């Protein structure tokens, strides 16, 4: 659905509540959908293992399988976040809808509270309840040191522990990853609504062996 079109007070490109008197007919309405084109690509990890190693080490097969699954998961995350399109997936950092917000008075990769507020303010209202922060791992200390002084002489820290070992910022979850660009480069801190990112998986991950 074209859920971001609210022109004329309607939703989904044309649905709007009408108030009618008893017995009066309701006007016919039509919503609008958006076309999404998905291009299939194949992701592969090829590993050459000698039969001696596979036979002599009892747990090697299971260990290799776990390693491959972890590498595939990390590879998919990398594609969906930083993929450049073409032969790769088109990641969120390189999507046409990405909006870059410059920091205010930022230097040496410092994060300013004004920067965080600008990013949250540019998020579409419908996405503010679903969005998450993605942050470079090296931003952890910098984000923990962002604070807002109050008139009473106290300070407020926008990033807080969520009680489950994670963090939230302005009420939204913060996920740290090493996939994002280095601190100080564009994309080291991202606010994204993943409900607007489409992924089509034609089949589940399979592990195949050949002698």
Regions found by a protein language model. Give the residues of each.
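Acidic/polar, low-complexity extended loops/arms that serve as protein-protein interfaces
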Residues: 1-130, 150-156, 161-169, 173-175, ...
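Short active-site loop/helix that positions an aromatic residue
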Residues: 140-149
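Short, intrinsically disordered, charge-balanced linker/junction segments flanking boundaries
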Residues: 183-192, 196-211
């Amino acid at each position: 659905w074209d859920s971001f079109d609210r022109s004329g007070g309607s939703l989904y490109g044309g649905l709007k509540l009408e108030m009618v008197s008893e017995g009066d007919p309701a006007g016919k309405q039509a919503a609008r959908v958006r076309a999404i084109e998905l291009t299939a690509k194949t992701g592969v990890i090829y590993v050459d293992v000698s039969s001696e190693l596979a036979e002599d080490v009892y747990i090697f097969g299971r260990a290799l399988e776990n390693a491959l699954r972890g590498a595939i998961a990390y590879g998919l995350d990398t594609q969906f976040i930083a993929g450049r399109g073409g032969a790769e997936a088109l990641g969120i950092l390189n999507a046409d809808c990405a909006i870059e917000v410059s920091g205010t008075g930022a230097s040496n990769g410092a994060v300013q509270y004004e920067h965080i507020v600008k990013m949250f303010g540019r998020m579409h209202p419908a996405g503010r309840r679903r969005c998450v922060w993605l942050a470079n791992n090296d931003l952890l200390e910098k984000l923990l040191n962002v604070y807002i002084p109050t008139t009473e002489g106290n300070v407020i820290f926008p990033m807080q522990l969520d009680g489950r070992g994670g963090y939230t910022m302005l009420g939204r979850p913060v996920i740290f990853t090493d996939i994002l660009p280095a601190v100080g480069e564009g994309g080291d801190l991202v606010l994204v609504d993943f409900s607007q990112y489409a992924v089509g998986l034609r089949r589940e991950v399979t592990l195949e062996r050949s002698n």
